[in-house]
Amino acid sequence: MASLVFSFRKLSLFFHTTRVISCQESCAVLSRSFFSTHIVGDEPILVRDFIHSALYDANHGYFAQRSRSVGVMERSIKFNQLEGRKAYMIYLDKIYKQSDMSWFTPVELFKPWYAHGIAEAIMRTANLSVPLKIYEIGGGSGTCAKGIMDYIMLNAPTRVYNNMTYTSVEISPSLAEIQRQTVGEVRSHQSKFSVECRDAADLSGWGEVKEQPCWVIMLEVLDNLPHDLIYSENQVSSWMEVWVEKQLERESLVELYKPLQDPLIKRCVEIVNFNENDQAKSSLLSKAKGVWSRAFPKPRKCWLPTGCLNLLEVLHRVLPKMSLIASDFSYLPDVRIAGERAPLVSTKAHGSSSDYESYLDAKGDADIFFPTDFLLLEQIDHYCSGWLKLHGDKPKTGKKRRTIILDTSSFMEEFGLPSKTRLKDGYNPLLDDFKNTKFYLSVPTHNIK
């Protein structure tokens, strides 16, 4: 059963058992495909650039190769007709074997109810006296977009549906086409839905600043955003940024450490450290740490969500009145890669999943996905809105945001219809299987400083 649970596209990872690829196997696999080493040319690159290429390279990246495996289920699961968890797992196994898909997203597994919960959250919070504008980043198969538009068509005032627009920002051309087909099944949706095939984190793709209120939806986007890695020799040494370089005369990659100099990394480090307790900065504690680190030196690594910071900086700049709904992992089990907020690097073949021991082994055949520190996400959101000021920031107007972090079960109990995903014995996979995921909601306020 463990292998089919992975097909949830990671969301039930606390059930997930994997086979770790040995160094010997990794080297053998690497010798068959040199894409990962070709990511790095003669000059070193930052870890975030390596990860971006490994995932999103147009020809060899993981999502370019796996876009066809993003499944669209022919029909919704009739949860109320299943006896219990065992019957549910058997049914899932049958679906995956019939479809030959690597994974279905949760919005697909629980359609239309997952998307309906998001739509209800939007309708309760949005100002429906102005045209409703929704952007979805990384829209997958289009099931979320269709579910939200269906719900608004059936439950909102007619003028709200008639005047709404829904824009998907999708980096994959093949997924963009699937989204058009999925949403286009309802003819009245077609004039309201559009796909822009581009990178949402690229400021130039957005054009002029859009001052109208809008919603931005990001489901399982944060986990695949590029991260940077910083390194310290011990508990008190300064952080250094990590670069990836190719070893001379060898088809292998190694890490290179440099003093912090990248502006995005430096901003992210400052946000991470913003709420550091004043006692941690005291000279007495600093001296104690120094003695301890010399007696028991321990290298440190920390993964930084610089891709998230970059994306939110872009969104707040071009959509200053946006409201945000994001859902992702709050933690990942059995992570073997070193560092705080470290990712899982996992590949799947012939129905079984395998975890790599190093992110450097990713070569377009492996998903690289990170846990989301939702409190840090909140800090980044406040920084990008201008409310949180860092040392040395230029004076600027900032708007406070009203935010809330909810477990997936709490979100769906508040905004969804949990009875629709409950099995006969009371087991509810949407509420019971997603303990390692959360929702983040953020809306602008009128408070300015």
Residue ranges, per PLM feature:
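Charged, glycine/proline-rich intrinsically disordered loops and linkers
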Residues: 71-104, 249-292
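A mobile, often basic/glycine-rich helix-loop segment
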Residues: 215-283, 343-348
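A short SAM/SAH-binding and catalytic strip from SAM-dependent methyltransferases
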Residues: 201-206, 210-235, 298-306, 310, ...
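A structural signal for short, well-ordered beta-strand segments and their strand-loop junctions
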Residues: 134-136, 168, 215-218, 323-328, ...
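Rossmann-like AdoMet
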Residues: 2-135, 141-214, 230, 375, ...
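Short glycine-/acidic-enriched loop or helix-start segments at secondary-structure transitions
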Residues: 146, 226-228, 336-337
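Long, Lys/Arg- and hydrophobic-enriched amphipathic alpha-helices
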Residues: 104-109, 277-449
